[in-house]
Amino acid sequence: VTITSGTPAVLGFTPDRRQEAGKQFVDVGIAEEHAVALASGIAANGGKPVYGVYSTFIQRSYDQLSQDLCINNNPAVLLVFWGTLSGMNDVTHLCFFDIPLISNIPNMVYLAPTCKEEYLAMLEWSIHQNEHPVAIRVPATDVISCGEPVESDYSNLNRYKVAHRGSKVAILALGSFFGLGQSVLSLLKEKANIDATLINPRYITGVDSELMDELKADHELVITLEDGVLDGGFGEKIARYYGATDMKVLNYGAKKEFVDRYDIQELLRANHLTDEQIVDCLLYTSPSPRDISGS
């Protein structure tokens, strides 16, 4: 059953498609709370609900996410659209607070695909599994297709994917910011001959402790990139994990603030989220260039 809350176009449900779907499609109106409660109830009774919602509106349903869905561990699927700094830019419709909101509720599995193929594979898995409520942060902006094989089973939770194995610096590039991670990887090689490790975390809700421990052997610096607010976000989980170790961790994301009618390029620069700014920060702040380049 497909569910929307006043925004059927978020899932491409035109009037013709809604007519064709019949009772398999439900729009509850501007009532996100009811949509999540409905999805939870359907899942509890063996159905396969998929609720599509814009990031900016999911905040209205926090009580139902926690009390109805996650406490009961009902395997409904939530598709969170436009969870990105590049989404709607007026102060009442900001789209970058969903990671702290959703990912810190117990039992929830929040996934961050990096491309079309990964998104569709995660969606297929989430519909057929029966163990967890699953939310998927649908890739936004210029994320289209990777053209590479992706995994089909995500049951082994919190296992990150190493996209490129290097040393000294590890880049954890979450979801829509994976492309930024690729740019940082290339620029580090070009500017300082540093062959960094690039990681696709995939899971927003947990830490791959085995991989994080492996990095200690030949890495001095871990950076996280997330297309959202830093406070309560993904990067803080990684920083906390390494808190009692010698590993240096730098988190890149947006400052916790209300911004209105902003220019996205200006916002990215203000938060040091361009590849040039990130690489300059890595090379000219602690640890020193000598530490991470070995020169």
Residue ranges of each PLM-predicted region?
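Thiamine diphosphate
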Residues: V1-V134, D142, Q277, ...
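Secondary-structure boundary/capping residues
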Residues: N74, L111, M247-K248, G294
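Single conserved hydrophobic/aromatic residue that forms the stacking wall/gate
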Residues: Y284-S295
